[in-house]
UniProtKB/Swiss-Prot annotation:
Its EC number is 2.4.2.9. Pathway: Pyrimidine metabolism; UMP biosynthesis via salvage pathway; UMP from uracil: step 1/1. Allosterically activated by GTP. GO terms for biological process: UMP salvage; uracil salvage. Belongs to the UPRTase family. Uracil binds at I193, G198, D199, A200. This is Uracil phosphoribosyltransferase.
Length: 208
């Protein structure tokens, strides 16, 4: 497993705007999608390609096309949907798998309430989408679910991540790569990332 911080001037600039208190819903959505495109660029660097000959304007030309495993994007409801369009802009042929969890108030553990996975999930590369990797509990449950379904090539894409969540995933799933725009300072007592983004779901959907 590797943790990849996508350290780029455009990413840092856009993330800085995302952190602003009072940012509009439309602006937050747009920036979340823009950063998601850049995360996808990094997360797909290792896709296999093969040569192909096509007819260009001046005759035949050899080009490359992506081959091998197909991709499924896996937004975690609901906030992960805010990253989905940006990722699909980069990999428009990807299938969409959706998972949803709620937290049990007694055990504080994630409980699955919705799952719809792409066909042939065992033959696909899964890109899990969630704006924030905080405690790692929901991500852990998502990875477990995908692996039980036969998926072995899994990556997670996050706008920001907390060290605590990263450590948890590294220990439990060393074969899963994490891509994030920032590793933030820590979690507060309520489990929010500091400095973080606040409630990304509310900011994406305009709710409170």
């Amino acid at each position: 497993m590797a943790v990849h911080v996508v350290d780029h001037p455009l990413v840092r600039h856009k993330l800085g705007i995302l952190r602003e208190d009072g940012i509009s819903t439309s602006r937050f959505r747009a920036l979340a999608q823009e950063i998601s495109r850049l995360l996808t660029y990094e997360a797909t660097k290792d896709l296999a390609t093969e040569a192909k000959t096509i007819t260009g304007w001046a005759g035949e030309v050899e080009v490359e096309e992506i081959k091998g495993k197909k991709i499924t994007v896996v937004p975690i409801l609901r906030a992960g949907l805010g990253m989905m369009d940006g990722v699909l802009d980069m990999v428009p042929g990807a299938r969409v798998s959706v998972v949803g969890f709620y937290r049990d108030e007694e055990t504080l553990q994630p409980v699955e309430y919705y799952v719809k996975l792409a066909s042939n999930i065992d033959e696909r590369i899964a890109l899990i989408l969630d704006p924030m990797l905080a405690t790692g509990g929901t991500l852990m449950a998502t990875i477990d679910l995908l692996k039980k379904s036969g998926c072995t090539n899994i990556k997670g894409l996050f706008l920001v991540a907390a060290p605590e969540g990263i450590e948890k995933i590294v220990k439990a799933h060393p074969d899963v790569d994490i891509y994030t725009a920032s590793i933030d300072e820590k979690l507060n007592d309520a489990g929010y990332i500091l400095p973080g983004l606040g409630d990304a779901g509310d900011k994406i959907f305009g709710t409170k």
